[in-house]
Amino acid sequence: MMDFTQGSILKKLLRFMVPILGALILQAAYGAVDLLVVGRFGSTSGLSGVSTGSQVLNLVTFVVTQLAMGITVLIARYLGEKKEEQIGSIIGGGTVVFAAISLVLFVVMVGFARPIAVLMQAPEEAVGLTAAYIRICGAGIFFIVAYNVLSAIFRGLGDSNSPLLFVFVACIVNIVGDLVLVAGLGMDAMGAALATVFAQALSVVFAIVRLVKKGLPFTITGYDFRWNPQCGKFLQIGLPLALQECLTQGSFLALCAFVNRLGLEASSGYGVACKIVNFAMLIPSALMQSTSSFVSQNVGAGEQKRAKKTMFTGIGIGLLVGCFVFVLVFFRGNLLAGIFSADAAVVQRGYEYLKGFAPETLLTAVLFSMMGYFNGNGKTVWVMLQGLIQTLLVRLPFAYYMSIQPDASLTNIGLAAPISTAFGIVLNVACFLYLEHAAKRS
């Protein structure tokens, strides 16, 4: 376990963040491999099916990750407060809660896969493959949820290396699975979904074995595996984050539906662009996750000034890397899109979206670091509220308006993300200054 309450903030934050970033890169990589292999060896309908279906899976995964953030923050806080004996009941209660969530997701994704595909306005020729992708991923949702919860537990313990190993295993298995099922057996989108589920299953087995063998500073008993007071505590932290993430990802699903109305090429191009966007957002996402744990442990130890310095350090790291990512996405986005598809029209449509989205790579460095700071302080209701405002008042209305124009442009639709993020930064700066003023007065 890593002690974040002393020593160089920059060095320790980077040391903790790099494995998280590595895990996110590998996670995005095995998602991208699905699209890459289907794009090269499958059909255009299969590519659209994976593109649209993976948007649904991303929604589920990101919401579960944010809900599990409550476990991460609470474990880190108890470590800072030297109350390790409380952690066993967090893990036991979390297992029960997320098992119930998995059961609900299983029923919805398997039983309503086709209506979901239709709701997403998947192109008519891709509805069947989109539904198949969603149904297969839904059948394996227990493994997908379990992986994210186990990773949250390890990060809360200050161990970001183990989740990196878990996703490395999943990535290798998924690549092999895609090559065998899609390129070899011609299973198209269904093969990609099967490879994803099997990879997550093996990763979960590996994670459980590592947790059991790990020398833990607490004990877990059978009595911990029930609804207990810790469940309410981590849900109080995680639920607002999950709702905020649900609406954010939901807005991107709506965006996907807006784009799908523009035709198969636009749908496939947007899917390709989304995979590149996933990679571009990895640094801010890693910063938010690492900052949340870092800040939470310091808040638990009463080191509020150090917690604030952590936020500003995160912003600096994010902006430095964000400049490079912005240049790459804005000026060479066509080359990036060409990695995922050999269809010139699909590549061009993907690049159109990326040019509008590019400023987001800089703005999220600020926004996500601030969100990590608020998460670590337990201000997750605020994180939810600012996300609601961004989504409902800016991102969705702007994207919808741009999508219904006679000469609808994917570049203009892509601008919805950076414009809403800029608005979110203003809101978060105002909240930070308000809390600082209130703290000085008290």
Protein language model features and the residues they cover:
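Small-residue-rich hydrophobic transmembrane alpha-helices
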Residues: 47-107, 144-163, 269-333, 364-386
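Hydrophobic residues within alpha-helical transmembrane segments
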Residues: 18, 22, 53-59, 96-100, ...
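N-terminal transmembrane alpha-helices
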Residues: 4-36, 40-41, 55-70, 74, ...
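Transmembrane helical elements of multi-pass membrane transporters/channels
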Residues: 15-34, 136, 170, 199-203, ...
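Short runs within selected transmembrane alpha-helices of multi-pass transporters and secretion channels
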Residues: 68, 137-155, 163-171, 192-205, ...
